[in-house]
C-alpha cells in the first residue's frame, strides 16, 4: 500500500521558502505536539502524538541505511531497504517503509512483506520533496529535507529526506544521505533526538568528521553509524574522538528511554556478510 503525503517544491534551503513550506504548516492551531519536535513547531493536520509509552524497542541493522525499528507494541518500521548491492538479502516484514532517496540502494520496497504503508521523502519524479507527518498506530513519523552530494558536472546536489520516528517515548532520527551538517532550519524541524542513525561514508554524504559534527549539533544519547559499507577505516575515524564506543557482535540491540546513556555513546552494530542470515 503506497501512501503519498502532500508534496512541496522549493529552492535549495532558501530560508523564507523553507519555513513557508515545511515549518509554517506546523504552526497552525493544533494543540497536540510531538515530544521530539521543537516545542515551537506544532504539527498540522489530523495526526496525533501517540500515547506515551516506556517499553523497550528493537533496532536491527541489515547494512547501508536499511533498518527495522520495532516498538514495544510490535509496530515495525523499515527504513531504506536496499536492492542487490553486496549485502545479504534479508527476509523482512514491516508495517511502514520509509524511503529517503529514490535509488536502488534505498527504495527496494518490494522486499518488505506485509503490504506495508510506503512513505516516500520525494515525490514521483525525484525532484520535489514530500512532507510526511503522520501517526501510524503507536509511532509518529515525520521527515526533514536533506541533500546528498552529487557529481556537479552531471547531477549537482540530489534531494532526499531524513526521518524522525517517535516510539515508546524515544526520538529516533535516521539522517538519510545527508551531505553536510544541518542548518538552523533543519535543526528546528528535526527537534529533539535520543537515538541517531548517522551516515558516515563520505564521498556523496558526510564522512566521519561530518558525522561527529552532527553528533555535536543534535546531542543524541545513542549513535548508530550507517552507510559505510565494509570500510573499517571510515568507522575507525568516526570512533576516534571523545565519544565512548561499543562494538557489538550482533546486528541488533534493544533499548528504552530509561536505559539510554547519559551522554552520547556510539554503538557499532555488526555488518552482515554472506552466511550471517
Report the location of each language-model feature.
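Core dinuclear metal-dependent hydrolase active-site scaffold
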Residues: 34-92, 120-191, 251-277
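Cap/insert and terminal regions of metallo-dependent hydrolase folds
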Residues: 180-273
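Short, basic, low-complexity termini and linkers enriched in Ser/Thr/Gly/Pro
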Residues: 1-31
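Active-site neighborhood of phospho(di)ester-bond hydrolases with catalytic His/Asp-centered motifs
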Residues: 78-81, 93-114, 119-121, 173-176, ...
Amino acid at each position: 500500500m503506497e501512501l503519498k503525503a502532500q508534496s512541496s517544491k522549493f529552492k535549495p534551503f532558501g530560508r523564507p521558502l523553507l519555513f513557508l513550506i515545511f515549518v509554517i504548516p506546523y504552526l497552525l492551531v493544533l494543540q497536540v505536539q510531538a515530544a521530539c519536535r521543537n516545542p515551537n513547531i506544532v504539527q498540522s493536520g489530523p495526526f496525533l502524538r501517540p500515547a506515551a509509552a516506556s517499553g523497550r524497542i528493537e533496532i536491527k541493522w541489515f547494512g547501508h541505511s536499511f533498518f527495522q525499528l520495532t516498538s514495544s507494541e510490535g509496530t515495525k518500521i523499515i527504513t531504506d531497504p536496499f536492492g542487490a548491492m553486496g549485502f545479504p538479502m534479508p527476509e523482512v516484514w514491516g508495517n511502514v517503509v520509509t524511503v529517503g532517496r529514490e535509488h536502488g540502494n534505498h527504495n527496494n520496497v518490494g522486499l518488505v512483506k506485509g503490504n506495508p504503508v510506503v512513505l516516500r521523502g520525494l515525490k514521483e519524479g525525484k525532484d520535489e520533496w514530500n512532507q510526511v507527518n503522520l501517526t501510524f498506530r503507536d509511532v509518529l513519523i515525520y521527515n526533514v529535507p536533506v541533500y546528498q552530494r552529487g557529481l556537479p558536472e552531471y547531477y549537482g546536489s540530489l534531494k532526499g529526506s531524513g526521518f524522525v520516528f517517535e516510539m515508546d517515548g524515544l526520538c529516533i532520527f535516521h539522517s538519510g544521505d545527508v551531505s553536510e551538517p544541518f542548518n538552523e532550519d533543519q535543526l528546528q524541524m528535526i527537534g529533539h533526538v535520543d537515538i541517531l542513525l548517522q551516515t558516515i561514508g563520505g564521498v556523496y554524504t558526510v564522512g566521519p568528521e561530518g558525522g561527529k559534527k552532527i553528533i555535536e549539533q543534535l546531542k543524541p544519547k545513542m549513535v548508530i553509524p550507517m552507510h559505510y559499507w565494509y570500510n573499517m577505516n571510515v568507522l575507525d575515524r568516526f570512533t576516534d574522538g571523545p565519544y565512548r564506543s561499543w562494538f557489538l557482535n550482533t546486528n541488533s540491540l534493544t533499548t528504552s528511554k530509561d536505559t539510554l546513556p547519559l551522554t552520547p555513546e556510539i554503538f557499532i552494530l555488526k555488518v552482515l556478510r554472506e552466511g550471517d542470515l
